[in-house]
Amino acid sequence: MIQRAACFSPNSVEKDLAILAAVAERLQCKGHQVEMASEESLTAMGYDIILSMGRLPETLAWLQREQEQGARVVNTPEGISNCARSRLLSIMEHIGTPIPPQEGLDGYWLKRGDAAAQSKEDVVYVQDRESLRQAIVDMAQRGIREYTVSAHVKGDLVKFYGVCGTGFFRYYYPTDDGQTKFDDERWNGSAHHYSFDVQTLQGECERLAEAVGVEVYGGDAIVRNDGSFCLIDFNDWPSFSRCREEAAEAIASLIKIKM
């Protein structure tokens, strides 16, 4: 099991470690030998199954080599790479995932495009086009020249979590429990709990997960007041902090299927 490098766990290092530990505990209880490693200490050992939260380029290259040698990898290096925002947006557009429009009257979101967010500055809300242009300049000065832009969508912010092939899917309103990474939830305000079709959301998420190539996933959606929704974020192997024990059971079940 590969831990996620701290740079990819902003404000979430302990939570990310906790989900791996919970999965490891369940696999060990089933009689499996489990080893934990950091992204910085990987060596080729001929493992049968590798569970990885890693995102460093070196880690993905290592996973690719292990996969070519016959190891089963969750999530695959290809899938993890596809979660970089620019690639992800291209896949979403290709398969028709409901996403925010590029233009709107309620502000814009500028997001780092070459990798997952590593700091608060990688995901920025601005109120108008002039502010957007300056935010792009600021991001470029940090060495980031690949980015995505989308219009802000009003509605309930929903965080979702899933494990493909197990039926596991959960969603939560972060403003209900106050758990936050960068406090970006404030731009949508407290949840109104608009009614929407959960099965349709799950179906869209699983369809995207298949297209991206990840089996353990999470993300964010906005539910509008008419019940329609759009996906605004999708990522490989979240911390599952709101449903850790259930998620660990589901991930362990997924591994059993692969054995």
Which residues fall in each region the model found?
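Conserved N-proximal alpha/beta basic substrate-recognition cap immediately N-terminal to
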Residues: 3, 7-101, 116
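A short glycine-rich, hydrophobically flanked beta-strand micro-motif that places a catalytic Asp/Glu
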Residues: 37-39, 147-149, 158, 214-226
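A short beta-strand motif that forms the metal-chelation/ATP-contact edge
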Residues: 47-51, 111, 160-162, 227-242
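Short, solvent-exposed loop/turn segments at secondary-structure junctions
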Residues: 56-57, 79-81, 115-116, 154-155, ...
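Conserved anion/nucleotide-ligand pocket segment
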Residues: 108-134, 138
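Phosphate-binding site of ATP-dependent enzymes
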Residues: 126-212
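C-terminal active-site "lid" helix and adjoining low-complexity regulatory extension at the edge
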Residues: 210-214, 223-259
